[in-house]
């Protein structure tokens, strides 16, 4: 196949791919997505559509420097959250290396920006699956593809397509019970999944009608990670601090850590 034939073949494939994406999102949304995401991301999104994982894409529900989260539906109309990691900045790359290099699951760290963001997405998916299997309430993981993570959408029961509020914006009605729930999740995470969230606070716990759901699992590390004790202590301290501000008579940091690690 000559250069001209290859170019024509590529252009025809791009046209077919774009037509397929038009079926799951309106043209304004697709144009916005094309402005933000590169071709490999669009190809991965196309594959998820072609594989029957995503049926319809709606708008952005959360946007940050590292990722955007979209409300979507699967082909059967069930709500999904589609988290798409953006091109990795040098600052983000420096920030995540410590969560990867000490993790035995990712002993061959690739520092190429694209490969690193794919690894980070895969890491979050695997952490979600381990936490979910251990009985921790997290968004159910569905699929990871390149820099795209598909999972359960934790929505506001009152308005479809709107995410449930964060704990920082919607304090629990029964703080004592909520504290017990979160500490139980940390215990299960450590002793069943053998993980530490490593970034736990009221900023990444959702409150859906008093059901607490922990999100943002990219930073979670295995118990064998050299910094796991430091991360665990920080997680517990953050939770105790938050609930103490709500007026709860919280246990001491030492007491909680001893209970979790069994010493």
Can you annotate each of these PLM segments?
Residues 112-138, 144-145, 162-198, 203, ...:
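Conserved kinase catalytic-core helix
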Residues 22-25, 105-108, 163-165, 214-219:
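A short alpha-helix capping/helix-coil boundary motif
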Residues 33-163:
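Conserved ATP-binding subdomain of kinase catalytic cores across diverse folds
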Residues 1-21:
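Long, low-complexity intrinsically disordered regions enriched in Ser/Thr/Pro/Gly
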Residues 14-38, 47-48:
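N-terminal, Lys/Arg-enriched amphipathic/low-complexity engagement segments
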């Amino acid at each position: 196949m000559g250069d001209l034939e290859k170019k024509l073949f590529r252009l025809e494939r791009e046209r077919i791919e774009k037509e397929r994406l038009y079926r799951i999102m309106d043209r304004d949304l697709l144009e916005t997505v094309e402005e933000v995401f590169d071709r490999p991301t669009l190809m991965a999104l196309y594959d998820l559509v072609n594989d029957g994982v995503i049926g319809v894409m709606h708008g952005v529900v959360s946007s940050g420097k590292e990722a955007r989260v979209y409300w979507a539906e699967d082909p059967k109309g069930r709500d999904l959250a589609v988290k798409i990691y953006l091109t990795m900045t040098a600052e983000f790359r420096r920030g995540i290396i410590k969560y990867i290099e000490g993790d035995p699951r990712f002993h061959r760290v690739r520092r190429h920006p694209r490969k690193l963001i794919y690894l980070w997405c895969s890491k979050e998916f695997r952490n979600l699956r381990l936490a979910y299997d251990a009985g921790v309430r997290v968004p159910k993981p569905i699929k990871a593809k390149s820099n795209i993570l598909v999972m359960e959408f934790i929505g506001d029961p009152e308005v479809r397509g709107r995410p449930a509020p964060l704990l920082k914006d919607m304090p629990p009605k029964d703080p004592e019970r909520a504290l017990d729930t979160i500490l139980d999740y940390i215990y299960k995470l450590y002793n069943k999944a053998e993980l530490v969230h490593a970034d736990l606070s009221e900023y990444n716990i959702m409150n859906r009608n008093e059901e607490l759901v922990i999100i943002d699992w990219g930073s979670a590390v295995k118990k064998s990670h050299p910094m796991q004790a430091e991360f665990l202590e920080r997680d517990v301290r953050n939770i105790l601090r938050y609930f103490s501000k709500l007026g709860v008579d919280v246990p001491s940091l030492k007491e909680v850590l001893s209970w979790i690690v069994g010493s």
